[in-house]
Amino acid sequence: MSAKTEAQKDNTMKDAGITQGAGTTDPVIAQVLKHFEAGDPAIMGLIAADIDFRIDHYKDDADIAWQSATDIEGFAQVLTRLGQEVFPQGTQILAADTQDLGNGWFLTRFEQRFFYARSAAMAESVTFITTHQEDGKMDFFREVVTTVTEI
């Protein structure tokens, strides 16, 4: 049995458009993104009870005050509202590149395509997500939506 090369490790999640930095194992954020894309409620099993969650938008006038949570119940409410108000037709992952920053911290560049309910049009977005995981659960999530472009 041969060890995987670094290039093979980087491509372990290519089926979901997710790549990782060299030398990493599957981070929780990669699993969370796959479940999010699939609309799979198993996503909740990857979230810590005391999750610190927030989505920010760069130069966007959208009301995002509700896009934060400090516990798993609040996260479930945000996730439900995202599904209803932002992603009513789901989302498609175009790319996700995750880098292991050490000590449970990860940085992900995330690209997705979705029907954006706010503008009633197909859109693509690029975001940067900083996460922390401990004991197989994500306990910190900060997403900065840098662009939402109608296509």
Segments predicted by a language model, with ranges:
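Charged/polar, solvent-exposed surface patches and flexible loops
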Residues: 34, 45, 77, 81, ...
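A beta-strand edge to alpha-helix "cap/lid" segment located at domain peripheries
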Residues: 4-20, 83-151
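A generic structural signal for ordered alpha-helices
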Residues: 14, 20-22, 29, 53, ...
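Short, low-complexity N-terminal intrinsically disordered segments enriched in polar/charged residues
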Residues: 2-49
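A solvent-exposed, acidic/Ser-Thr-rich amphipathic alpha-helical stretch
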Residues: 49-96, 101
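Alpha-helical interaction segments
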Residues: 25-26, 43, 65, 100, ...
